[in-house]
């Protein structure tokens, strides 16, 4: 009952298929980093009574659980969690994540790569999300090939303090739209942000202040359904790399306010509009 650290507890137990922790008392645990990571055979995990109210670190918690298809996390309290980076990364068979009880605190700082390489994930629900202290959203949904529904309360998905958005939606090739009111005034890296988003037709860039951004490489690379873009808010006076920025945007008919692209510091424009 006095245990506070369960990090790496079952990490790398590659042959365990079923794990029932119904009677575990975890009320005082503060660290669950990597607790179930790399359990590549696990397909049945019972943690519905897990007490997580004091946990501060959930990073890599289910990392590379490539055979698990369902996670019931309704009992999870995340009010004190600071780190959720790579939490579900590599959960290749999960199709749906209901996380409406997640992200409800002001303490959360890291969510980079949280859902990366969840190949079959179709839907994520995060309607109570609070991201106002997040600085790193890089690789957040990277390689979520099947993701077609992203339920987010846009007023709470705050990006005011985010510095890094590189590869945030990389290869989300089934996502038809992204409804997020982006505030990017502190972001420095947007490289590969929407790369490979094959189904995206429109992206609202109204909140895109890019005055601090230095890297726009591959930003819209392979957005082959994109019809138009308005760069009205783009300020690119600090950008050094615009290579392959609009590469293979095959249906792109119109880029409004393209004159806003200040290229005075750009060193690389290779393939910028190639294949348009």
Where do the language-model regions lie?
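Negatively charged
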Residues: 1-276
């Amino acid at each position: 009952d006095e245990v506070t650290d369960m990090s790496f507890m079952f990490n790398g137990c590659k042959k365990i298929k079923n794990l029932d922790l119904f009677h575990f008392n975890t009320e005082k645990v503060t660290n669950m980093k990597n607790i179930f990571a790399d359990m590549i055979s696990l397909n049945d995990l019972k943690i519905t009574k897990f007490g997580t109210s004091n946990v501060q670190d959930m990073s890599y918690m289910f990392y590379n659980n490539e055979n698990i298809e369902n996670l019931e996390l309704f009992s999870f309290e995340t009010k004190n969690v600071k780190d959720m980076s790579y939490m579900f990364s590599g959960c290749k068979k999960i199709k749906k994540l209901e996380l409406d009880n997640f992200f409800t605190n002001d303490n959360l700082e890291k969510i980079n790569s949280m859902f990366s390489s969840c190949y079959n994930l179709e839907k994520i629900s995060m309607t109570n999300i609070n991201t106002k202290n997040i600085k790193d959203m890089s690789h957040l949904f990277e390689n979520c090939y099947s993701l077609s529904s992203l339920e987010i309360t846009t007023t709470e998905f705050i990006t005011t303090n985010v510095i890094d958005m590189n590869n945030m939606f990389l290869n989300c090739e089934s996502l038809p739209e992204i409804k997020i009111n982006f505030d990017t005034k502190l972001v420095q890296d947007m490289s590969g942000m929407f790369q490979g988003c094959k189904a995206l037709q429109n992206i609202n860039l109204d909140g895109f202040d890019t005055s601090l951004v230095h890297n726009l490489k591959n930003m819209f690379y392979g957005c082959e359904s994109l019809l138009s873009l308005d760069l009205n808010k783009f300020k690119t006076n600090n950008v050094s790399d615009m290579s392959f920025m609009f590469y293979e945007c095959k249906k792109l008919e119109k880029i409004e306010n393209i004159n806003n692209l200040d290229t005075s510091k750009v060193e690389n424009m290779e393939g910028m509009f190639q294949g348009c």
